[in-house]
């Protein structure tokens, strides 16, 4: 499979999305063994992954405008809150109990993780393509990056899905805070 993004629970377990199989795997870091494989029935192409270590919850972000909330002990999906389209990264703020995803449609989706409902509470407008994200828990800031793109090249047999080039001097870092 295609591992996408790991998350550690701080107790010796690692979790990773397997993007092409719509799965999450759990690995024991000390013994270097696979201890569980869980199918994500309502989560297609999971990419980013965040973890709530205290509650034992994983937050994979999925194509189709969904985030899954998964129990780290059982692999059971608890909720599927709505997020923006084209997600890439996930984050979790343990102080404010918020899960979030950065989305290619130019949004950051914010999910309330304080209770059992896991409802989307906000969609913050960023810029189209701002999918790569980092969260700094020391200051509560979210950083997303993007750039402006030129026209998409014509597809060829050797490159059936060409990517457009980035326009010079167009790279930006956007900083989001409460």
Language model features with spans:
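Predominantly soluble domains enriched in secretory-pathway, periplasmic, or organellar proteins
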Residues: 1-178
């Amino acid at each position: 499979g295609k591992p996408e993004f790991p998350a550690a629970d701080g107790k010796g377990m690692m979790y990773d999305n397997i993007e092409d199989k719509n799965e999450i795997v759990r690995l024991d870091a000390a013994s270097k063994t696979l201890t569980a494989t869980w199918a994500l029935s309502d989560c297609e192409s999971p990419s980013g992954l965040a973890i709530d270590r205290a509650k034992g919850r994983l937050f994979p972000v999925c194509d189709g405008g969904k985030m899954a909330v998964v129990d780290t002990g059982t692999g059971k999906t608890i909720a599927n809150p709505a997020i923006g389209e084209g997600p890439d990264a996930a984050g979790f703020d343990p102080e404010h109990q918020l899960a979030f995803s950065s989305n290619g449609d130019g949004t950051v989706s914010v999910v309330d993780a304080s209770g059992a409902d896991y409802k989307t509470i906000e969609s913050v407008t960023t810029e189209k393509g701002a999918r790569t994200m980092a969260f700094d828990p020391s200051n509560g800031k979210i950083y997303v990056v993007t750039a402006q793109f030129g026209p998409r090249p014509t597809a060829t047999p050797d490159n059936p899905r060409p990517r457009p080039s980035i326009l010079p001097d167009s790279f930006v870092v956007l900083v989001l805070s409460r």
